A protein has these predicted regions:
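Non-heme di-metal
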Residues: 1-164
Length: 164
C-alpha cells in the first residue's frame, strides 16, 4: 500500500512542510509506549477508516482505486486487532488518543467548514474519527458504500487488468 500511495504522491507532489510534520507524527507513533497492536488498531480504525472513505469520495481515479484496495485489507486488520486487543485486555491510553487526534487533524488540516458538501467538511470527518475510536462504528459513512469507483475509461489501457 505504501508503494501505491507513494506513486500518487509522486504524481501530485508533496508539501515540504507537511512532509516534515508527517515525519514527526510518524516518529511519535513509533515511540509511543502503548502496545504495538493497540497502536495499529487505533491508527487503522480511527484514522485509516476515516481517510479511505475520504479518498474514495474526494480523490482522483488513482486515489479512489488505491483506497478501495486498502479498505479490503484494513477491514481484516481491524477485526483481528480488535479481537487480540480485547483478549489481551489492552485499551488506548489518553496520550494515544491525543496522538490520534493530532494525526487526523494534520491530515484534514486543509479542510474547513463546508455548508454545501459534507464530504468537504472537516468536522464531518473528525466526528467520524471520534465515533470510530469510542464506539467502533460511524453510521455517517453508510453513503460510502455508494462512493463512485473509477470506470475502465478513466485509466490508461496499460493499467487495466489483463486476462489473456
Amino acid at each position: 500500500h505504501d508503494l501505491a500511495l507513494q506513486y500518487i504522491v509522486d504524481a501530485n507532489g508533496a508539501d515540504e512542510t507537511a512532509e516534515k510534520e508527517g515525519k514527526l507524527l510518524r516518529d511519535a507513533w513509533i515511540e509511543h509506549p502503548d502496545h504495538c497492536l493497540l497502536k495499529a488498531l487505533v491508527a487503522e480504525r480511527a484514522i485509516f477508516f476515516v481517510l479511505l472513505p475520504f479518498f474514495r469520495f474526494n480523490g482522483d481515479p488513482a486515489l479512489r482505486t488505491v483506497a478501495a484496495d486498502i479498505s479490503r485489507d484494513e477491514q481484516i486488520h481491524v477485526g483481528c486487532n480488535t479481537l487480540v486487543c480485547h483478549e489481551l485486555g489492552l485499551s488506548a491510553s489518553p496520550s494515544l488518543d491525543k496522538l490520534r487526534k493530532a494525526t487526523i487533524n494534520w491530515v484534514l488540516q486543509p479542510l474547513g467548514t463546508n455548508t454545501y458538501d459534507k464530504y468537504l467538511d472537516k468536522k464531518f470527518w473528525l466526528d467520524a474519527s471520534d465515533r470510530l475510536m469510542y464506539e467502533g462504528k460511524a453510521p455517517e459513512f453508510s453513503d460510502t458504500k455508494a462512493a463512485r469507483m473509477p470506470a475502465f475509461f478513466e485509466h490508461a489501457n496499460t493499467n487495466l487488468p489483463q486476462y489473456a
